[in-house]
A protein has these predicted regions:
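Conserved active-site and cofactor/substrate-binding residues in soluble primary-metabolism enzymes
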Residues: 7, 11, 38, 87, ...
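Short clusters of hydrophobic/aromatic residues that line enzyme substrate/ligand-binding pockets
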Residues: 64, 129-131, 145, 187, ...
C-alpha cells in the first residue's frame, strides 16, 4: 500500500483521485487545497466531463468521505506546514501548478513525505519521467522530486521514440491541437499571454508549449531537434499532437504504421494505443492512454513524415500519474 497526499485538488488532482480508485495499491491519506470542503466534495462528485462519481461523497470542516473512507483535508498555503509525517505519506502529488520548482516542491519532503511527483514540467527536478519511455532511468536512491512532464510530452514522446528508434529523427516540428484549460479565460480578460487573454470558448488560440523542447529530458538524443507550439481550441478536453519530422532514412506509410502498432502491442502497451478507426476528439475522452496513434493520418513524402496522436489531456495524464506513483511506491 502506497500512502499518497494530494496538494491541489483541481482538474488534475480530482482526475487523479478518480483514477486512483481502481488501483488498490494507492491509499489517499490527505488532501490540501484552499477551496472550501463543500466545494471540493461537490466538484469531486459531479464532473462536467467524467460525469457523476457514483459513490457517496460527504464532507465535514476537516475531511471528505468517499464511499465510507474518510480523508483529512487541509488548507495550508505553505507545503512545509502539512502533516505528511503524521499521516505517513509516502508520496505527495504536487498538482497545484504553483510549486513546480524543486526548492518549493521539496517542502513536502521537509514535511515528512518520501517522494514528490509534480504534475507539470518542473525546474531543477531530480528527473522527468514519461512512463513507457524513460521510467527505467528512475533511481530511488537519488530521485526524490520527480516531474511527470506535461500531458503533451506524454503523447509526443512515445511516437517520437518509435520513429527515432526505427529510422532516426533529424529534426521536426510539432503542433498540439489542445483543449482549453483553466489558464485561459471565458471572456476577453487581461493575461500576460495576449493570445490567452482572448475568450477560450469562441477562438482558436495559438500559444506556447514546452513539450517539444522538454522531449530532450526523456529522450536526450533528440535535444535541439524538435520545436513547436500549441493551438488551443474550444473544447474542454481531448487533444491531438501533430508531429512532422525529417527522418534519417526513408520510410513508407505502411512501415511507420506497422512500427507504431508493434510498439502499442509490445514495449509501449498501456501507454501507446493504435487505431485504424476514423475517430474524432470526442471518441478519446476518458481514454487512459498517453497517446492514441491515428494510423489513417500518417503521411509520407520521402523521408518527411507527418503523424498524429490523440490524447485526453486530463484523464490520460492522470492515469500516468497513477502509474508513476505506483512505480515509485514499489521502491520505497
Amino acid at each position: 500500500m502506497i500512502n499518497v497526499g494530494i496538494n491541489g485538488f483541481g482538474r488534475i488532482g480530482r482526475n487523479f483521485f478518480r483514477a486512483s480508485l481502481t488501483n488498490p495499491e494507492i491509499n489517499i491519506v490527505g488532501i490540501n487545497d484552499l477551496t472550501p470542503n463543500e466545494t471540493l466534495a461537490h466538484l469531486l462528485k459531479y464532473d462536467s466531463i467524467l460525469g457523476r462519481l457514483g459513490l457517496e461523497v460527504t464532507f465535514t470542516d476537516d475531511s471528505i468521505t468517499v464511499d465510507g473512507k474518510t480523508i483529512k483535508v487541509f488548507s495550508e498555503r505553505d507545503p512545509a506546514n502539512l502533516p505528511w509525517a503524521l499521516l505517513k505519506a509516502d508520496v505527495v502529488l504536487e498538482s497545484t501548478g504553483h510549486f513546480t520548482k524543486a526548492a518549493d516542491a521539496g517542502k513536502h519532503i521537509s514535511a515528512g513525505a518520501k517522494k514528490v511527483i509534480i504534475s507539470a514540467p518542473a525546474s531543477d527536478e531530480d528527473i522527468t519521467i514519461v512512463m513507457g519511455v524513460n521510467h527505467e532511468k528512475y533511481d530511488p536512491a537519488n530521485h526524490h522530486i520527480i516531474s511527470n512532464a506535461s500531458c503533451t510530452t506524454n503523447c509526443l514522446a512515445p511516437m517520437a521514440k518509435v520513429l527515432n528508434d526505427n529510422w532516426g529523427i533529424v529534426k521536426g516540428l510539432m503542433t498540439t491541437i489542445h483543449a482549453y484549460t483553466n489558464d485561459q479565460v471565458i471572456l476577453d480578460f487581461p493575461h500576460k499571454d495576449l493570445r490567452r487573454a482572448r475568450a477560450a470558448a469562441i477562438n482558436m488560440i495559438p500559444t506556447s508549449t514546452g513539450a517539444a523542447k522538454a522531449i530532450a529530458l526523456v529522450l536526450p538524443e533528440l535535444k535541439g531537434k524538435l520545436d513547436g507550439y500549441a493551438m488551443r481550441v474550444p473544447i474542454p478536453t481531448g487533444s491531438a499532437t501533430d508531429l512532422t519530422v525529417e527522418l534519417a532514412k526513408e520510410a513508407t506509410v505502411a512501415e511507420i504504421n506497422a512500427a507504431m502498432k508493434a510498439a502499442a502491442n509490445g514495449a509501449l502497451k498501456g501507454y501507446l494505443t493504435y487505431t485504424e478507426d476514423p475517430i474524432v476528439s470526442s471518441d478519446i475522452v476518458t481514454d487512459p492512454s498517453s497517446c492514441i496513434f491515428d494510423s489513417g493520418l500518417t503521411k509520407v513524402i520521402g523521408n518527411q513524415v507527418k503523424i498524429v496522436g490523440w490524447y485526453d489531456n486530463e484523464w490520460g495524464y492522470s492515469n500516468r500519474l497513477v502509474d508513476l506513483i505506483s512505480y515509485v511506491g514499489k521502491t520505497l
